[in-house]
């Protein structure tokens, strides 16, 4: 069953954290959940071509902290911070709490599963060969230190009448090992032949001991076995 379970959800609380961190009373839970959905939908729609990999949302009683992880922070911030002020003002419309917006850079976008999936999707839209896109992404990922990568593409590949699934794997992808740091993401490419689905698994090593971080107030991996 290891191959059928979402690797991120499978490891939540073990070596992965939640993208939304807050506590709410029963009457407020639904409202906060909808607010999170609207915030992420706005960022995905309006912050385009900026390499946004994920959006972290943390809440206190009267504040909402939104952290955007991106490989191109300059595109998100804009000239003299003009774009980030616009994003902050628009996000304030989705919640009654004060919004604090932070931008964090993704150092190695080639080893980030979501950014790799989006990159392949963009190449497929431009009619680049799916095999070339897959192999190029895998080579870049392994060259920058990943221990293994698996790429799966489904749909009318090459414009064929019958949809099929093709996948490639290099290195190790230990699906059942909970201490394995596996990044997983999905993306869709809207082509003239229909939607093509892309799934990415990236294995970065094994996480062993953990320690408490005073800075982030979270339990973080202490050592990753290379």
From Swiss-Prot:
Pfam families: KH_2, Ribosomal_S3_C. Gene3D superfamilies: 3.30.300.20, Ribosomal protein S3, C-terminal domain. The lineage of its organism: Bacteria, Pseudomonadati, Pseudomonadota, Alphaproteobacteria, Candidatus Pelagibacterales. Belongs to the universal ribosomal protein uS3 family. GO terms for biological process: translation. One of its GO terms (molecular function) is structural constituent of ribosome. One of its GO terms (cellular component) is cytosolic small ribosomal subunit. The keyword Signal does not apply. Residues 39-107 form the KH type-2 domain. It comes from the Bacteria. Part of the 30S ribosomal subunit. Forms a tight complex with proteins S10 and S14. Keywords: Ribonucleoprotein, Ribosomal protein, RNA-binding, rRNA-binding. Binds the lower part of the 30S subunit head. Binds mRNA in the 70S ribosome, positioning it for translation. This is Small ribosomal subunit protein uS3.
């Amino acid at each position: 069953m290891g191959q059928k379970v979402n690797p991120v959800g499978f490891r939540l609380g073990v070596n992965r954290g939640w993208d939304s961190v807050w506590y709410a009373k029963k009457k407020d839970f639904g409202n906060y959940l909808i607010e999170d959905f609207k915030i992420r939908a706005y960022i995905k729609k309006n912050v385009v071509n900026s390499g946004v990999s994920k959006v972290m949302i943390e809440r206190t009683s009267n504040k909402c902290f939104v952290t955007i992880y991106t490989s191109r922070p300059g595109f998100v911030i804009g000239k003299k911070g003009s774009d980030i002020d616009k994003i902050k003002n628009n996000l304030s419309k989705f919640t009654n709490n004060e919004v604090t917006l932070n931008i964090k850079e993704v150092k190695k976008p080639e080893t980030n599963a979501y950014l790799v999936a989006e990159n392949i999707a963009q190449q497929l839209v431009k009619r680049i060969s799916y095999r070339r896109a897959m192999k190029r992404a895998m080579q870049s990922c392994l060259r920058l230190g990943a221990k293994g990568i698996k790429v799966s593409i489904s749909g009318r590949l090459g414009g064929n009448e019958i949809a099929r699934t093709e996948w490639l794997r290099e290195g190790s992808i230990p699906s059942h090992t909970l201490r394995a740091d596996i990044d997983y993401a999905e993306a869709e490419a809207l082509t003239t032949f229909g939607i093509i689905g892309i799934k990415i698994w990236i294995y970065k090593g094994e996480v062993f001991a953990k320690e408490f971080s005073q800075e982030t107030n979270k339990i973080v991996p202490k050592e990753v076995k290379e």
